[in-house]
């Protein structure tokens, strides 16, 4: 079975990149490759700068918790970074792309990130993208849990918060 590459993996990757922005083009490419992105084109400093600019806009989506303004912010990213859907079989099986084949590395990523975020929020819930609820943590996470009740970026933050609540009661 073929899995849609615009789903949970891109929104998880873009959250990771937003939490710890890549400092070099090489780091961006390596982190994308480690996340399973097929790298079939060169990347340069312009791509890194464009991804950083996209992340600034994506953070507006993250930090907007009211559903309608959140959707409007994401729609702006989609309009700027994603193209009309089209079928392609460039890698041996038919699937949908939301971009032209000849786009830059950054445009490949930003299309994948904007569409992936849209699919994540429509399939799992408009509220399933947030910042960690732990004290002094601002990490972003995409809630991919079954019940949709994730409030911490990691088990470590969850445990620290539980200890903090316990000590506050003592």
Where are these predicted regions, by residue range?
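Contiguous alpha-helical segments
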Residues: 165-170
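Short helix-coil boundary/hinge micro-motifs
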Residues: 1-143
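Short, non-ligating residues that shape and space the ligands of small metal-coordination modules
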Residues: 143, 159, 163
């Amino acid at each position: 079975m073929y899995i849609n590459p615009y789903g949970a993996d891109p929104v998880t990757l873009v959250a990771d990149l937003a939490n710890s922005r890549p400092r070099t083009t090489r780091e961006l490419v390596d982190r994308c490759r480690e996340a399973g992105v097929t790298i079939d084109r060169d990347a340069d400093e312009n791509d890194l700068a464009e991804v950083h600019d996209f992340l600034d806009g994506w953070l507006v989506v993250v930090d907007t918790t009211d559903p309608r303004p959140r959707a409007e912010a994401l729609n702006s990213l989609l309009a700027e970074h994603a193209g009309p859907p089209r079928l392609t079989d460039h890698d041996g099986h038919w699937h949908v792309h939301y971009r032209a084949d000849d786009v830059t590395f950054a445009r490949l990523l930003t299309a994948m990130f904007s569409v992936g975020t849209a699919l994540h929020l429509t399939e799992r819930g408009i509220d399933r993208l947030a910042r960690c609820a732990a004290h002094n943590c601002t990490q972003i996470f995409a809630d991919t849990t079954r019940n949709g009740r994730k409030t911490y970026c990691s088990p470590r933050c969850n445990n620290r918060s539980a200890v903090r609540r316990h000590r506050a009661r003592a």
